[in-house]
């Protein structure tokens, strides 16, 4: 029987499945950070349990860390406690930790792939909703809650029901300057922020195959923003070349053997999906969100929509509420909307390719008066690579702030946040009310679009930027 990639991955990891019961899956990799793990480790202690397979568990600090200093106290008391607990727990249970002073420290979904912890064919979990990022490698990766974190630590397994399947095909080839971020925002604009609910999404088509691994990670990172459980891209030579030689990747003959298996991780011809969505890449322009969920998105050269134009009464009410919160009036061109802050970073867009794209726009220009612009590399290795290429100098010369790795302004859990009423062009993944700080107004864009907003002081179409 023909199977989808998701079905192959799921079936390969079923440990036990009784009649009328939820299947038990084996988990190949468990990624841990400071926010969702303390209670899980406490649960192990309370029941006198050990971490079942510490060699398959990897921890880092990212959500709470300061991006201005490596001082554990810099982000406040709660952040300090959570980071100290992570140090204590990793020491006690034998889990490898990339702490603030480790060269590999960074955002968990950046760190995993670049160290070869993430590999095709794996099941990967983390107490973080954007774990879907790792699906870019043809791995089944999804976020879990704290009680599930404890269960995986204790057993290396997790009960999971089978999801529906969705195929999203992006046909043709994207125009120059159109990035994975634009593609995924256009997809969510079509499906809506709940269009993928109950599904695992496989992204395919010529436009997806043309993406680098960084681009595919951006794509899968935001699968959760359409309500999906996970996102997948079938592995290919681009995947294998990215993985080869990384710290935790197989070596020598083992790598060659692994590639032979990884090549089987494709959806079979004739396999059926529950839902199919199709887009034409040529029709995708640079995207900017205007509302308070990622599905409220338009092309940069469009005008802010009028709620009256929505036929669905729920969508109309949502649009009215979003515009009121965002302080926008229907009909105004997006390119006339001024911004206060720019954030280039997050697990969506903080990899070296993202920083190169932003630096290309920033080079020879200056951040507009009154705008604060932050560039936050996703990890220590990304920061080191960017500095080796001189990207930090380009940003600093243009007036951007060059920061230390961390989740930063993606979420208001550290010192990088918006003040009430401030408007931000952000390369992150969520634009909910208060996501970047109470009363903050978030517009999701690509790194190049964020840099363009920084140097012009408003949203600008990078295709015509002089």
From Swiss-Prot:
Extract one GO BP annotation from the record. Answer: L-leucine biosynthetic process
Q: Which cofactor does it need?
A: [4Fe-4S] cluster
Task: State the UniProt keywords alphabetically.
Answer: 4Fe-4S, Amino-acid biosynthesis, Branched-chain amino acid biosynthesis, Iron, Iron-sulfur, Leucine biosynthesis, Lyase, Metal-binding
According to the record, cofactor stoichiometry and binding are noted as: Binds 1 [4Fe-4S] cluster per subunit.
Residues binding [4Fe-4S] cluster are 347, 407, 410
What family is reported? Answer: Belongs to the aconitase/IPM isomerase family. LeuC type 1 subfamily.
Q: What does this protein do?
A: Catalyzes the isomerization between 2-isopropylmalate and 3-isopropylmalate, via the formation of 2-isopropylmaleate.
Annotated protein name in UniProt: 3-isopropylmalate dehydratase large subunit
**UniProt source species:** Enterobacter sp. (strain 638)
């Amino acid at each position: 029987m023909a199977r989808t990639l998701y079905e192959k991955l799921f079936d390969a990891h079923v440990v036990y499945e009784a009649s009328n019961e939820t299947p038990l899956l084996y988990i190949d990799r468990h990624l841990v950070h400071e926010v969702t793990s303390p209670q899980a480790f406490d649960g192990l202690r309370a029941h006198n349990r050990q971490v079942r397979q510490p060699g398959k568990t990897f921890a880092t600090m990212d959500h709470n860390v300061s991006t201005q200093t490596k001082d554990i106290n810099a982000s406040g008391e709660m952040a300090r406690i959570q980071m100290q607990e992570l140090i204590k727990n990793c020491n006690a249970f034998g889990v490898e930790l990339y702490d603030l002073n480790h060269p590999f420290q960074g955002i968990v979904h950046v760190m995993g792939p670049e160290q070869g912890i993430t590999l095709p064919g794996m099941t990967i979990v983390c107490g973080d909703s954007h774990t879907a990022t790792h699906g870019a490698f043809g791995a089944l990766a999804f976020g879990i809650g704290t009680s599930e974190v404890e269960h995986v630590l204790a057993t290396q397994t997790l009960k999971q029901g089978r999801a529906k399947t969705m195929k999203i095909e992006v046909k043709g080839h994207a125009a120059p300057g159109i990035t994975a971020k634009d593609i995924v925002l256009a997809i969510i604009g079509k499906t809506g922020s709940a269009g993928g609910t109950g599904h695992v999404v496989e992204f395919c088509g010529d436009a997806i195959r043309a993406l680098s691994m960084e681009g595919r990670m951006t794509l899968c990172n935001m699968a959760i923003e359409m309500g999906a459980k996970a996102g997948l891209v079938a592995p290919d030579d681009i995947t294998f070349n990215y993985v080869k030689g990384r710290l935790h990747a197989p070596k020598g003959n083992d790598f060659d053997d692994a590639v032979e298996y990884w090549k089987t991780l494709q959806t079979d011809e004739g396999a059926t999906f529950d839902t199919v969505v199709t887009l034409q890449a040529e029709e995708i322009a640079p995207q900017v969100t205007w509302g308070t969920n990622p599905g409220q998105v338009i092309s940069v050269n469009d005008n802010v929509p009028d709620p009256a134009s929505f036929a669905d009464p729920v969508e109309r009410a949502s649009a009215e509420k979003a515009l009121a919160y965002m302080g926008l009036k229907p009909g105004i061109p997006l390119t006339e909307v001024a911004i206060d802050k720019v954030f280039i970073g997050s697990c969506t867009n903080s990899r070296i390719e993202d920083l190169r794209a932003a630096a290309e726009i920033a080079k020879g220009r200056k951040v507009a008066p009154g705008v604060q612009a932050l560039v936050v590399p996703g990890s220590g290795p990304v920061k080191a690579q960017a500095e080796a290429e001189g990207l930090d100098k380009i940003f600093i010369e243009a007036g951007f702030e060059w920061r230390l790795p961390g989740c930063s302004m993606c979420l208001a859990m550290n010192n990088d946040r918006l003040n009430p009423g401030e408007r931000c062009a952000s390369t992150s993944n969520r634009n909910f009310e208060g996501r970047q700080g109470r009363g903050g107004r978030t517009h999701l864009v690509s790194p190049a679009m964020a840099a363009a907003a920084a140097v012009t002081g408003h949203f600008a179409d990078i295709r015509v930027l002089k």
